[in-house]
A protein has these predicted regions:
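N-acyltransferase acceptor-side catalytic subdomain
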Residues: 1-348
Length: 348
């Protein structure tokens, strides 16, 4: 998928050619993208916001991609050498540079990868980067023998609600279609998949990477990627899908497309969650990795979470100091997690 990202980057992105083929891109970044919703609304309600809001959009160099869970780094480079090289190459020519999605003690990575990430964060701090908590990555360890056992770990009220929603499964036809299947040679089907993806993108609170139709076409026609598409149809009409990939013994849930309002009427989010868990279990996988968005509903469904860190280098020294002081306001998922912990301890 990295090659597909490079060949067909999201709208408004330009791929960067970096040392040792480290993936990266440049894009206009809205500084309010990850700000807590209530604060964002207050800022947007300020006088003349539409006139001065352009100053909140900054041309930024990103190290990483939007199609991988974690940043990808060349094994041949030490963390310190890589960070120095990147800062010298990009730090002077962009107002802002972000090394995105650096793992923090991730249960999804081995000890070697986690140690490298620790050294990378230390090197970033030494080079003047501001460290900002990233989004919450949802995952479920496949440490149960049946979906019923998994549901048994949830509260009785949640079990009852999920089982009630699951009854809609009887009205659906569900197919597992590997990427590269002959059906994806039909341009009309690619168009339909892309339209359903845009439905989800348009109703999302965060708008950053709008994938292109060309990217979807290459992804769905790639037989060698390990991709599996879960199609949901009602009376032969496509009302939703998940595009997942099997990688390193894990089922990675990457993209979802939904037809509204049918997807809500048939509880597709809940049904697809259990379908994906069952697939991971039946194929002997170790984890289901469920992505970055909608942490509240994924928590309700029983997910655990691991956080990443973004290392931000601001070219202007004064603004760099301000970024360090106000960085906590850009950590909306961490704020959500901190609010969630007391509730969990109280048993709610």
């Amino acid at each position: 998928m990295i090659d597909q990202f490079s060949a067909h980057p999201p709208d408004g992105f330009q791929v960067l050619r970096l040392p040792q083929a480290t993936p990266g891109f440049e894009a206009e970044f809205d500084l309010l993208t990850t700000v807590d919703g209530s604060l964002k609304r207050r800022i947007e309600s300020l006088p003349l916001y539409r006139h001065w809001s352009k100053w909140l959009r900054v041309r930024t160099a990103f190290i990483g991609t939007t199609v991988s869970e974690y940043a990808l780094f060349p094994a041949a480079w030490s963390a310190r050498s890589l960070v120095k090289r990147l800062r010298k190459a990009l730090g002077w020519c962009y107002p802002m540079m972000i090394i995105k999605d650096i793992p923090q003690h991730s249960p999804l990575l081995d000890d070697s990868a986690n140690r490298y990430a620790e050294r990378l964060l230390e090197a970033c701090k030494a080079e003047g980067f501001v460290l900002v908590e990233g989004q919450a990555l949802a995952y479920v360890p496949i440490d149960f023998t049946s979906v019923e056992e998994y549901l048994g770990r949830l509260s009785s009220s949640r079990r009852k609600d999920i089982r009630r929603k699951w009854r809609k499964r009887e009205d659906l036809t569900i197919r597992e279609v590997p990427t590269g299947d002959a059906q994806f040679q039909l341009d009309a089907l690619i168009d339909e998949y892309y339209r359903l993806y845009l439905n989800v993108y348009d109703q999302s609170e965060i708008h950053f990477d709008r994938l292109s139709r060309e990217f979807f076409e290459q992804m769905l026609r790639d037989a060698g990627s390990g991709g599996m598409v879960f199609e949901y149809r009602h009376e032969d009409r496509l009302i939703g899908y998940n595009v997942c990939f099997v990688h390193d013994g894990k089922l990675i849930d990457k993209y979802i497309g939904l037809q509204y309002p049918e997807a809500r009427s048939f509880n597709l989010y809940f049904i697809s969650w259990l379908i994906n868990l069952d697939y991971a279990l039946s194929h002997g996988l170790t984890h289901y990795v469920a992505g970055w968005t909608d942490p509240e509903i994924k928590s309700y469904l029983g997910a655990s979470f691991t956080f990443t860190c973004h290392a931000v280098y601001v070219r202007n020294a004064l603004l760099r100091g301000l970024a360090r002081r106000f960085s906590r306001y850009f950590e909306s998922d961490r704020q959500w997690s901190d609010r969630r912990e007391p509730a969990n301890r109280s048993g709610s």
